[in-house]
Amino acid sequence: MVDESADKPVELTFEEQLAAARAFAMRSLARRESAESELARRLRQQGYQEEVIEAVVDYCRGYNWVNDERYGAMAVRSGAAKGHGPIKIRFELRRKGLDDNQIDAAFEQPELDWFELALALLERRANVADLADFKLRMKWLKYLLGRGFTQEQGRYALSALQDREL
C-alpha cells in the first residue's frame, strides 16, 4: 500500500505560519535594520500569506523592531558616510518604500551639511591642478552629480576647492 499523503505538502495552520514568519522576521531584523516594506517583501518571497505578513509587520512595529523613521535616519547617515548625495539617498529610500514625509524627516539632521560633504568628497578624489581646466572641472561636477549631489552643491565644492588652493 502506497502512502499518498507523503506527496502532498503539509498545510500549516495560521498560527503555525505566524510563528514561522515571526521567527524569520526576527532572524532577518537581527542581521540588519529594515524598512517595513522591505520586511514585507522578504516575507512575501518566503511565500507567506498577506494576512500573516501584515500581522508580523504589526507585531514587529509594536515592539519597535521595525521603524521607518529610524531606518530612514540611519540610511541618510550611512549614505552620507559613503559619499552619496541627498538625491541618490532620497531615491534609495523611495525604492525601499518610505513615503515623502518619512524621507523629509530623515533628512532633518543638523549635523549633515551637504555642501561640505560634497567638498570633502572632492578633496579626497580630485587633483587641484585638474580644476584649472574647464573640461576637467565639468568632469568632476558630473562625478558629484552622479553621486547624488545637486548642481548647487557640486558648484560650491568646485569653487571652494579652487579658492582654497589660490
Predicted regions and their residues:
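An alpha-helical, amphipathic repeat domain used for nucleic-acid recognition
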Residues: 1-166
